[in-house]
Amino acid sequence: MTDFNLPSIFVPLIGLFFPAIAMASLFLHVQKNKIV
C-alpha cells in the first residue's frame, strides 16, 4: 500500500537531492579555498 508508493517517491528524490548536495558541497569547498 504505502510500501509500494515509497520507492517511486524516494528514488527521484534521492536521485535529484544527492547530486545537488554534492554540487553544493563542491562549490562551497572551491569558494572556501579560493581555487578559482
UniProtKB/Swiss-Prot annotation:
Residues passing through the membrane, by range: 6-28
Record GO biological process: photosynthesis
A Pfam family it matches: PSI_8
Membrane topology, record value: Single-pass membrane protein
Subcellular location: Plastid, Chloroplast thylakoid membrane
HAMAP family: PSI_PsaI (MF_00431)
Protein known as: Photosystem I reaction center subunit VIII
Keyword Oxidoreductase: no
Keyword field: Chloroplast, Membrane, Photosynthesis, Photosystem I, Plastid, Thylakoid, Transmembrane, Transmembrane helix
Family: Belongs to the PsaI family.
Function: May help in the organization of the PsaL subunit.
One term under GO cellular component: chloroplast thylakoid membrane
Principal location listed in the UniProt entry: plastid
